[in-house]
A protein has these predicted regions:
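Conserved hydrophobic/aromatic "anchor" residues
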Residues: 41, 65-66, 108, 116
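Short pre-active-site segment immediately N-terminal to redox-active cysteine/selenocysteine motifs
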Residues: 59-61, 65-69, 101, 138
Length: 180
C-alpha cells in the first residue's frame, strides 16, 4: 500500500475515534473557566472587525463552534437559524464561531441565510475550544451562557433544535424571573 493511502486511512481512523470519543467524554459546564475569562475572548467577524463574546452578555448566549467542512455542523445550523428567529425576541442570541477562513464562511452564511452573527478564526478558535473543555477538538461544540455570563450547558456533537430548545427555555424563564 502506498504512503498516501496509508495516511488517508490513518486520518479517517483518527477522525472516527474523535467522533466516537466525544460521545463518551462529555464536558461539564463546571469544568470551563470563569465567566469573565470565557467571555473576554475575541474573534474576527466576517468583515474583519474584532468582536468579544462579552458583547452579548445579558442575553442567553449560544456560542456554536463549527466548520464549513463538518457535516454534523452543517446539519444543525438550520435548527439554530430557526431558534434564533423564534427565541431571539425573548432574549436568546446565537453566535457562530467557524474554524475556517472568513471568505469561506462568508459565502456559506450568505448562501444559507444565517440570521445570527458569525465569527471566524483558525488556531485561535481551536485554542479557545480546548480552554473551554473540548480537549479533542470535536466539532460541532456548543457553549450556552446564562444572562449573567455563566456557562450553563456544554454540548459536544450535533445538537438538534428540540434538544437546544429544552436547554434554552428554562434559562429564559430564569432570566425573566430575575428581571421581575
Amino acid at each position: 500500500m502506498n504512503r498516501g493511502w496509508l495516511f488517508i486511512l490513518v486520518a479517517i481512523a483518527g477522525l472516527g475515534a474523535g467522533v466516537l470519543s466525544h460521545r463518551y467524554a462529555p464536558v461539564s459546564a463546571e469544568a470551563v473557566p470563569s465567566t469573565d475569562d470565557a467571555l473576554a475572548v475575541k474573534f474576527d467577524d466576517l468583515e474583519g472587525k474584532s468582536r468579544a463574546l462579552s458583547e452579548w452578555r445579558g442575553k442567553v448566549l449560544v456560542v456554536n463552534f463549527w466548520a464549513t467542512w463538518c457535516p454534523p455542523c452543517l446539519k444543525e445550523i438550520p435548527a439554530f437559524v430557526d431558534l434564533q428567529r423564534r427565541l431571539g425576541p425573548e432574549g436568546v442570541q446565537f453566535v457562530g464561531v467557524a474554524l475556517d477562513g472568513r471568505e469561506e464562511v462568508a459565502a456559506f452564511v450568505r448562501d444559507h441565510a444565517v440570521n445570527y452573527p458569525v465569527l471566524a478564526g483558525e488556531e485561535d478558535v481551536a485554542r479557545y475550544m480546548q480552554q473551554m473543555g473540548n480537549t479533542i477538538g470535536a466539532l460541532p461544540f456548543t457553549l450556552v451562557f446564562d444572562t449573567q455570563g455563566k456557562v450553563r450547558h456544554v454540548h459536544q456533537g450535533e445538537w438538534t433544535g428540540p434538544e437546544a430548545e429544552a436547554v434554552l427555555k428554562p434559562l429564559l424563564s430564569r432570566a425573566s424571573s430575575h428581571a421581575n
